Design a protein with these regions (language model features):
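Residue-level detector of family-conserved "landmark" positions at structurally sensitive sites
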Residues: 5, 48, 75-77, 120, ...
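Short, solvent-exposed loop/turn elements at beta->coil junctions and helix N-caps
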Residues: 7, 77-80, 228-229
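A residue-level signal for beta-strand positions that form part of recognition/binding surfaces
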Residues: 15-16, 87, 236-237
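Short beta->alpha junction loops/turns
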Residues: 21-24, 51-55, 79, 114, ...
């Protein structure tokens, strides 16, 4: 935490500006633009601080600072958005759509939302929809679930990450799954929808899954580096 010392500055020329933005994406763009303006004026980055109410607040901003190569360091550890189980579910759907049909990946999302697919049908390390459909052909209702799952992944194959997240939430039925899960666990649904909204913000501007996955790797590496260097002398914008 920062030690705070507050003093009135009646003669200060600086003014407090209050701005509102339609979303975090636009807000972060403005923050980056303002910092770059200060950098052009040779303002020391150590004189710039970005304050948030909680340590989850700056998750999207960190990605924006990295994209523009703006040095920064964090006073507190920031939870990695992409480590959340909901994020991992969304990423697993994308991996399946790209053709990564490993049994372990398939198992994690095959019943999110509920499709009543039993793990007993998955006997190989790689899942084949043709084999799975053959095994459930005597159960028309289950056959339809599996066919729909296969078709959803086919449709997602060439989507942008943002389009895919929207599709998973609405067309695949992940929003309904989250609602049911929250009711069952007696947890506020907003906690989960907030994660999905943050994922959507993160995915903006990426054309392919590979590009977004590269960003996720770089973001995770930076968080890990910041965590290891915590307490050391640092230069950059303070977050």
């Amino acid at each position: 935490r920062f030690e705070k010392k507050m003093e009135a500055q009646p003669n200060s020329e600086a003014k407090v500006e209050i701005r509102t933005f339609k979303d975090h994406y636009e807000e972060n763009k403005h923050i980056v633009y303002t910092i770059r303006e200060e950098m052009a004026k040779k303002t020391p980055l150590s004189q710039i601080a970005i304050l948030y109410r909680t340590n989850q607040g700056p998750r999207q901003l960190i990605g924006a600072l990295m994209a523009y190569n703006i040095p920064f360091y964090m006073q507190d550890a920031v939870p990695n958005l992409f480590d959340h189980w909901i994020s991992k579910n969304i990423i697993d759907y994308m991996k399946l759509a790209r053709g990564d049909m490993r049994r372990s990946t398939f198992l994690r999302v095959m019943n999110r939302p509920k499709r009543y697919i039993s793990r007993e049908y998955l006997t190989d390390s790689e899942v084949s929809f043709d084999d799975l459909l053959e095994k459930v052909k005597d159960k028309p209702w289950l056959y339809e679930y599996v066919e729909d799952f296969k078709e959803d992944l086919r449709i997602m194959k060439n989507m942008t990450p943002l389009m895919a997240i929207n599709y998973i939430r609405k067309s695949v039925g992940y929003n309904a799954y989250i609602s049911e899960y929250a009711r069952f666990r007696k947890i506020q649904e907003e906690e989960f929808t907030h994660v999905l909204e943050e994922l959507q913000e993160s995915a903006k501007g990426y054309d392919t899954y590979e590009e977004w996955f590269d960003h996720i790797r770089e973001y995770t590496e930076e968080l890990n580096r910041q965590s290891k260097e915590n307490g050391e002398s640092k230069e950059g914008v303070v977050v």
